[in-house]
Amino acid sequence: AIEKYMPKNAKAADIGMGSGILGICAKKFGASYVYGCDNDETVIEVAKENALKNNVECLFELNTADKINEKFDFVLANILHNVLADIMGDLKNLMNDGGYMVLSGILDEKKPVVLDAVKKYSLELIEEVRQEQWVALIVRKVD
């Protein structure tokens, strides 16, 4: 999904970054800038080390989506379905008009919870990507 939907030289965000792998991939696929945050202090250093090991520059810090004052062309969020639904408004606020977001880490049976939030915030569903019992949703912010 990163390779397919992220514009070249995109400004990208990885929300709930964990190990930082999605942000690191975005950087390797040509993002000009990658910001990643997580609310778990223990993962920040791990993510920074992973970026270093992969020779990419990413800004990783302790933060939450509601406190970020930047806009991004491409947003990645691999978080539990209920958290995705709860913070969908904050995630939308991070997106530039026409920007894409990949919502992943969703169990198939929990997909309706996330889709309801996508509809509630008027995001356009572009594609569903399935892998076994997991689903990723690609959405776009329409002006």
Q: Residue spans of the language-model regions?
A:
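Hydrophobic beta-strand segment of the Class I
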Residues: 12, 75-77
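Short alpha-helix
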Residues: 106-121
